[in-house]
């Protein structure tokens, strides 16, 4: 059993993240995060040098692209995204989506560095990223072994 004093409720981009298990709380080097995301949400197309990510779709539907392969995943389905292979995803369901992401490596550190502590378990006010915000995200990602390759997928 473990519990961290670090913030567990974060606003990342236009989504909300709850850290259920921090890397510091286990010897296995994994994090488990829950993501509440609005329709149309998608991170820049990117590649992780050190992390594998496994998405379990709790609610809604997402479209994932890994290299040249594209698939949709609905509630109850799992998508594994291996390190070293470019990927991205987009929320395609009208009511948004809720994902559980199990990740190895420094994904959680990037989330914490690029997020604000959330005032509540809710979506933040939506906003378009400014060039400064995009530059800051690219720098934080690079510091955590993630290379941004392009815009979010369609």
Task: List each language-model region with its residue ranges.
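Short acidic-glycine-tyrosine-enriched beta hairpin
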Residues: 25, 61, 68-86
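Ligand-binding loop in jelly-roll beta-barrel domains
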Residues: 26, 63, 83-109
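Glycine- and acidic-residue-biased ligand/ion/polar-headgroup-sensing regions
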Residues: 50-52, 56-62, 76
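A contiguous, mid-protein "functional segment" used to position or interact
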Residues: 94-140
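Conserved hydrophobic/aromatic beta-strand scaffold that supports enzyme active sites
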Residues: 19, 32-34, 54, 70, ...
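Conserved short histidine dyad/triad with adjacent acidic residue
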Residues: 18-19, 33-48
């Amino acid at each position: 059993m473990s519990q961290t004093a670090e913030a567990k409720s974060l606003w990342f981009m236009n989504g909300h993240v709850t850290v259920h298990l921090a890397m510091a709380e286990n010897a296995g080097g994994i994090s488990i995060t829950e993501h509440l995301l609005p329709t149309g949400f998608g991170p820049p197309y990117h590649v992780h040098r050190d992390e594998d990510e496994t998405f379990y779709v709790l609610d809604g539907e997402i479209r994932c692209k890994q290299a040249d392969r594209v698939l949709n995943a609905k509630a109850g389905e799992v998508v594994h995204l291996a390190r070293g292979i470019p990927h991205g995803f987009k929320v395609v369901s009208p009511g948004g989506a809720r994902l559980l992401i199990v990740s190895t490596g420094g994904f959680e550190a990037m989330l914490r560095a690029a997020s604000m502590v959330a005032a509540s378990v809710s979506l933040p006010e939506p906003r378009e990223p400014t060039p400064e915000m995009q530059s800051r995200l690219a720098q934080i990602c690079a510091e955590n072994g993630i290379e941004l390759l392009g815009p979010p997928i369609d």
